[in-house]
Amino acid sequence: MGVLVLTSAVIGFGSTARAEEAGPPDKSIEQRFEELDQEIRILKRKNELGQEAAETAKKSTAVVKAGNTGFSLESADGQHVIKLRGLLQADHRLYFEGASDVRNRTDQRAGDLNADGFHDAADSWLARRVRPTIEGTLFGKYDFRFTPEFAGGSASVVDSYIDARFDPAFKVRAGKFKSFVGLERLQSGADIKFLERSYVTNAILPNRDFGIAVHGDLVGDRLNYAFGLVNGVSDGGNISTGAEFDGRHEVTARLFATPFKNDYSVLNGLGFGVAATYTDAQGERNLNFTDTSAADATRNGLPSYLADGQNVFFRYSSAAVADGQRLRLSPQAYYYTGPLGVIAEYAQVRQDVSLTTGGSPAGGGAGSNTNITPNTNKKLRHDAWQVAISYLLTGEDASFKGVKPKQDFNFGSGWGAWELVARYSEINLDDDTFRDPTGTSFTGAYADLSTSAQSARSWTGGVNWYLNQNTRVALNYSHTTFDGGAGVGTSPINAAGTNVRDRPDEHALLTRLQLAF
């Protein structure tokens, strides 16, 4: 018994000694959980700080993009964007028959004329459009666009405007821009189905102008409206960026409805509307209009008209000036369903024109047409219309905004998109244009039947090959007939108009290689 007590005492003493040597007891489970939770909180906060830093860096880093729609630099929040785009068109014009109207021009500019007073239409290569574009958006709603033109041997500004999108139903555009008038004109130059636009667009309705316009979309984007106040241009005119010379403004208005837009209906591709312009136009006098070309700014307020092959077939007399009201009206429509597309337009212009005393000397130089001749003011009415049809053989959907091939061209894997196009377009000039103010003589008129035709009618057919969304090869064949003048030769028209002959027909083959991005 004594031995057991002694042994227990020894063991107890040893255990106590070891416990004292081991130090304080282990931490409780609660303490360890608290320490672990604290470490997790620290790591979580570090992760949050890293994410915040990454988000801050992301918000301040611009996004660079490159693709088939161009090149862009965009702020991280998408509120500020600048884009670089371009349009290049290389054309060839081949004339099987036709005339280049250079009559009534100085020898220095025209050279020697044939027995009929014409040069044959000249075959040529040309750069039709060379247009780099800088466009973008500031603060998410202020769009801008700047497009110069380097084709034609000189530089000019095509577009230069700001478009403030305050609301889909209320936008304000200011600067130089396409007038909200012609349907075909509002189609991009890269998306038009033919190499050249119709007589409605190129001859009657305005091209670009300088001013301000309010526009927008109503009724769920089913009704588009536009009202503008612009400087005003002659028929088919493209205003320069300089100051206006006559101080009068032109009012433009357009309503266009797409009532079945976004509906699952065969009519969802139908659009129709009407546009108009009005001004009181006063042309400048004492200018040498005879020596001007169709590309010159006709500051007499009156236009020259081009045939489908881009040769002048009508010009006013050098003594004629715009002198009063000018009203244009244009009903218009399009229809797209599947691969089929149709555009139809009509336009009429009513222009007050007067004759002036004198005119440019035969040898050129400053004119003496400084005074309006009394009782010569006359309202002349010209009109034009067109119907154009397109059909995509490869089954893509036709649209107002161009074609995107189902398959890009690649040997062995795809042939792009193929499209057939056909158009009939004509323009008719007021009979009174070619008579004197009394209406009894063909001499002393507002235009001369020996150099100008009364009407032009063009049949155009062609094919478009879209290699991809950016590249197109186009081929057009155009046949234009002229009625009532411009074929009389070098002899002036007589008072009775008995020696009027029609201008020779124009047969032209036009080709184009286009790159747009």
Please state what every model-predicted region is.
Residues 6-7, 13-89, 95-107, 112, ...:
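N-terminal periplasmic/intermembrane-space "pro-region" immediately following the signal or transit peptide
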Residues 1-3:
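Bacterial N-terminal signal peptides that target proteins for export
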Residues 69-282, 381-413, 417-435:
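Outer membrane beta-barrel
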Residues 118-119, 266-268, 276, 284-517:
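Outer-membrane beta-barrel pore domains
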Residues 64-65, 205, 324-325:
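A short catalytic or substrate-binding loop motif that flags glycine-/basic-rich loops and adjacent residues
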Residues 25, 34-39, 122, 190, ...:
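Helix-centric, low-specificity signal for extended rod-like, repetitive segments
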Residues 22-23, 28, 39-41, 93, ...:
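Intrinsically disordered, low-complexity regions of eukaryotic proteins
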Residues 40, 51, 80-82, 169-170, ...:
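Residue-level detection of beta-strand scaffold positions
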